[in-house]
């Protein structure tokens, strides 16, 4: 799993929720206006034909159950290898208090990339509290087996955990006088 951002990163860590083979990314990010949110990046292994989905399902369930900084503003994204209407993904959303920004916008099938018009929405995006999705689109084929799911996200600066004054920002070397 790779992680890149233009935003300020207050913290980032990879956690093996169920297996070291399927880590989950947890990061606390800061928008340009200072508003903070936690990011959960998830990509559980897909079950092979005839295999149980238990490992994948456990990874999805555990990923949304915690956020290291305990912020209420959360963006959960990734290739869940699961559809949003499955029991597992529906449970993830329900128990974590997440909203699906696709509601009222369409299913946004991303797999398989070459036949997405008859495909499955395996790539997920969920938000909660002050995190909002302003725009959601399927990107052009970039040579992957999935099409990119592109979201323009904002964080309500008035939300409980926005911290626009930077009270909870980690100290930088410049702030420490180094």
Can you say where each PLM-predicted feature lies in the sequence?
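Soluble catalytic domains of enzymes that build or remodel membrane lipids, polysaccharides, and related
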Residues: 1-178
């Amino acid at each position: 799993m790779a992680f890149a951002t233009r935003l300020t990163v207050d913290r980032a860590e990879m956690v093996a929720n169920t297996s070291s083979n399927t880590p989950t990314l947890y990061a606390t990010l800061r928008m340009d206006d200072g508003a903070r949110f936690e990011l959960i990046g998830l990509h559980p292994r897909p079950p092979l034909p005839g295999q149980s989905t238990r490992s994948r399902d456990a990874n999805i369930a555990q990923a949304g159950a915690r956020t290291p900084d305990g912020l209420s503003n959360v963006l959960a994204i990734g290739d869940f290898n699961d559809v949003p209407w499955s029991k597992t993904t529906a449970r993830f959303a329900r128990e974590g208090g997440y909203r699906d920004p696709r509601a009222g916008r369409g299913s946004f099938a991303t797999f398989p990339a070459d036949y997405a018009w008859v495909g499955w929405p395996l790539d997920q995006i969920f938000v909660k509290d002050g995190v909002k999705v302003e725009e959601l689109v399927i990107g052009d084929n970039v040579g992957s087996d999935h099409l990119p799911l592109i979201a323009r996200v904002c964080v309500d600066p008035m939300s409980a955990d926005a911290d626009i004054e930077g009270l909870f920002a980690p100290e930088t070397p410049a702030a420490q006088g180094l």
